[in-house]
């Protein structure tokens, strides 16, 4: 995404909608400017960062303060016209220099704490996701140089109150908000406009002559395909939660092969015949896992443990501990079966494959041998 693309509005029903930036971008900018102030020993009132999507943001700094080896600064969250629970709040960073040579990151007031497994962060750690952790540490390192150390604290005085309007508590994130954002940019878009934009990408791929397409829920899937399967990123299209819609569009456009690749947290819903995977439509993840574990002869204690889990990752720990890893191949096959059932009235349906991977990019299961799927996609 270029800077010009960021400045351009998103149009919906004739109305121009303004883009915004994530809590991760706010935390990164606040940490960067605090580090610069403590190095230069004077106040700074504007800072620029480059987001993971390549957009340069120039942001106003609020409440800057520097004293000795410590500085504090804040950035106000702006979600554009996609107003959420964190819109308008201040995200602070406090940077304290030291001689350790290392950069340590911690969450302070108003930043949630991870209390359950299953969201890709260690239990007891602050709810600062992987991409913001990386961008914060990189920005501070650039500011302080290669040899100094720093302690970075991210905090949000309104965080406890704002978090009550989010799903954090249901995910086991307690005491505040999460610092998130894979791209650093918030793009406002209605569901229909969003679906149409995804379909347009399919049309572009097909017009370029592609007959095989990989559908992924989001950025994590794109990285897995690129890094673990060696597949050309040009073959990958994001389907978001709109699995059924994107499959139907791929059929309409004449793709001969569809490969669904993603984390079980999204894709196992398809095994239950759920083709819109947003949680406000349907969930049934634990019910699906329990049903298919039972089909494989899993004992009641394991079924009970899985049924009581809040996240797929937590359930997977029990599944792996009990030695039922074969469930993942079984689910991948079931996903393909469900897709073909959905397309049963299509005259020449495409072939379908499914691949499931973990948060740490390990292959969990596939409908066919992974090498065979990858080979077909690269030929």
Curated annotation (Swiss-Prot):
Q: Which InterPro entries match?
A: CbiD, CbiD_sf
Keyword Acetylation applies:
no
GO biological-process terms attached to the record: anaerobic cobalamin biosynthetic process; methylation
A single GO molecular-function term is: cobalt-precorrin-5B C1-methyltransferase activity
Q: Which of UniProt's keywords are assigned here?
A: Cobalamin biosynthesis, Methyltransferase, S-adenosyl-L-methionine, Transferase
What EC identifiers does the entry list?
A: 2.1.1.195
Q: In which pathway does it act?
A: Cofactor biosynthesis; adenosylcobalamin biosynthesis; cob(II)yrinate a,c-diamide from sirohydrochlorin (anaerobic route): step 6/10
> Which HAMAP family has this protein been placed in?
CbiD
The name of this protein is Cobalt-precorrin-5B C(1)-methyltransferase
Can you state which reaction this protein catalyses?
A: Co-precorrin-5B + S-adenosyl-L-methionine = Co-precorrin-6A + S-adenosyl-L-homocysteine
Per its UniProt record, what NCBIfam families does this chain match? cbiD (TIGR00312)
Family assignment from sequence similarity: Belongs to the CbiD family.
Q: Which gene encodes it?
A: cbiD
The top EC class, named as a word, is transferase
């Amino acid at each position: 995404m270029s800077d010009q693309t960021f400045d351009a509005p998103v149009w919906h029903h004739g109305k121009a909608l303004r883009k915004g930036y994530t809590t991760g971008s706010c935390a990164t900018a606040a940490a960067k400017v605090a580090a610069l102030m403590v190095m230069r020993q004077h106040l700074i009132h504007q800072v620029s960062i480059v987001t993971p999507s390549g957009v340069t943001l120039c942001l106003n700094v609020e409440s800057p303060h520097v004293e000795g080896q410590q500085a504090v600064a804040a950035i106000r969250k702006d979600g554009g016209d996609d107003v959420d629970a964190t819109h308008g709040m201040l995200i602070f960073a406090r940077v304290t220099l030291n001689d350790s040579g290392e950069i340590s990151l911690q969450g302070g007031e108003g930043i949630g704490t991870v209390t359950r497994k299953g969201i890709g962060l260690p239990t007891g750690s602050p709810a600062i996701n992987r991409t913001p952790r990386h961008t914060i540490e990189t920005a501070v390192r650039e500011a302080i140089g290669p040899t100094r150390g720093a302690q970075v604290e991210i905090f949000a005085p309104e965080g406890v109150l704002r978090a009550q309007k989010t799903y954090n508590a249901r995910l086991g994130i307690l005491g505040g908000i999460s610092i998130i954002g894979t791209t650093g940019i918030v793009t406002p878009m209605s569901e229909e406009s969003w679906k149409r934009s995804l379909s347009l990408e399919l049309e572009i791929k097909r017009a370029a002559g592609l007959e095989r397409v990989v559908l992924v829920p989001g950025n994590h899937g794109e990285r897995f395909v690129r890094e673990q399967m060696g597949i050309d990123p040009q073959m990958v299209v994001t389907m978001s939660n709109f699995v059924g819609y994107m499959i139907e569009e791929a059929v309409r456009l004449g793709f001969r092969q569809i490969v669904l690749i993603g984390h079980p947290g999204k894709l196992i819903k398809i095994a239950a015949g759920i083709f819109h995977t947003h949680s406000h439509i349907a969930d049934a993840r634990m019910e699906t896992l329990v049903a298919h574990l039972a089909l494989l002869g899993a004992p009641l204690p394991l079924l009970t443990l899985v049924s009581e889990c809040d996240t797929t990752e937590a359930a997977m720990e029990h599944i792996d501990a009990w030695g039922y890893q074969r469930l993942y191949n079984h689910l991948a096959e079931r996903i393909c079966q469900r897709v073909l059932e959905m397309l049963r009235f299509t005259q020449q349906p495409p072939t379908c494959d499914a691949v499931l991977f973990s948060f740490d990019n390990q292959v969990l299961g596939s409908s066919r041998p992974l090498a065979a799927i990858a080979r077909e996609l690269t030929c």
